[in-house]
Structure formats: C-alpha cells, structure tokens
C-alpha cells in the first residue's frame, strides 16, 4: 500500500504566489494534477515551486493542465517540463534529500510498496471530447483557445483521442496482472453528477471540461483502483459502484473563488 497526496488547480499565476503557497507534506508521494500556474510565462517561479515540493516528497508527479501553456504553446510547455525532469533528476544536479520529478504526459511509472507490492501510475492531460454541435460554443467560451497559441477545438479533440487511446492500451496491457493501477489526469473522465458543480451541469461548454468514459476500457477495468483529476474546480471523493474505483479531486481553484472542500487530501492505494 502507498499513500499519495493529491493537489490541483492552485492557480498560483493570479495573484502570483508560487513563492508563498505551501503544501504540507502528508504522504511520501505528491500528485500535482495541473493548473498549478503558467509554466512557460512564469518558468522561473514555477520551477522554484517544484523544487520546494521535491525537498518534501519522495516523488512529485506533474500532470499538465490547460493553464500551463497559456501565453505560449503546448509544445513549448512540454519541452520545458521535460527539461526540468532531466535536469532536476540527473545524479550530478540532484541535491541530497531531493525527490524525483515525474512528468506524466502519456507516461507510466511503477512504485514499489513497502510490502513488495507494485502500484502502476498512468498519467496524461486527457483533454476532452467536444462534439461538433458544441464546438462553436466551446471555441468562444473557453479561454484556452484565446491564450494558447496555435490551439483550437480540432487539435484539442485530437489530443483527447490520442490520450484516451494510450490509456486504453496501457490498462489493457496490465489486465489481470494483479497490480493496482492509478490514473492521474487533469480533465475529468466522467459526467457523474457528483463530480460537477450543479450550476454548471447543463452548461453549453461542459464538454470542454469532462467526457463520459463509462464505456471506455480504461474506466471499466477493475484493475484501476483510483482515478484522480482536476479542472472542474469542484471537489469530490466517492467510489464508482460499477467498477469499485475511487474517484477523487482536490482542487483549490482561483484565489478569489476557492473551491469548497480543498484539504490535505491523501489517498491510500
């Protein structure tokens, strides 16, 4: 069994608070599930925030959210994140007592539990499936398409299908291996009413935030014991009756409109 601390949607970009926001360590492993801040525009501040977390956690998992590439591009954002991963983890540059940074962009990581058991962590942004009838509303109503260069609904949908295909393949490959699987994403994989603010459940731009994956192999698998995500600014923690998996979010939200229920959330797997 391992203990994983879950945090997302800190939005340290406004007001800028990378240097003062503290995460109190309650577990050896930390999952940052996106929208921590502007990764490219605030590169220096963001990486210093990560370094502080690495001094407190054995592993810091980083999933990129839709705000990370704002005022830049997705390619540039991922390029910087991968560079940090290399530089912060290489033996020559790694400080004593510093943890490991693991960027999850269609990536798999294995954690050995204290009893010899293995937990498989799968992570990606996921994005969402925007149907054609909602494309115009989402394009005009979601700020990502204004603030991320070279990004539109078509590319967003392509990224979703790519991430979903990867998740399905990874989970299928692990079927019946006897290992617990944890899935970490930024976007929501479900439209279960427990995962969304009642005020937004009928929103015309809802498909820009969540996708119903109830028929997808990665969701239906009973090997997946935990699916944690962010993006919705609405906190939840429940067990999906159909699969037995725990569904968890722990999102702070914007500083001036913080989400109810943001706590020091730790999940044991």
Place the predicted regions along the sequence by residue.
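Short amphipathic alpha-helices and their capping/turn segments at secondary-structure boundaries
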Residues: 20-22, 48-52, 97, 103-118, ...
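Hydrophobic alpha-helical segments and helix pairs
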Residues: 78-145
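Active-site-proximal loop/helix segment associated with metal-binding centers of metalloenzymes
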Residues: 120-182, 187-204
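N-terminal active-site segment of His-dependent metallophosphoesterases
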Residues: 1-62, 68-76
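Active-site neighborhood of phospho(di)ester-bond hydrolases with catalytic His/Asp-centered motifs
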Residues: 5-8, 30-35, 61-66, 102-106, ...
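Beta-strand-turn-beta hairpins that frame and shape the catalytic cleft
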Residues: 1-5, 108-123, 133, 180, ...
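Active-site environment of divalent metal-dependent phosphoester hydrolases
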Residues: 11-17, 38-41, 67-77, 110-113, ...
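Binuclear metal-dependent phosphoesterase catalytic core
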Residues: 113-115, 206, 211-226, 233-269
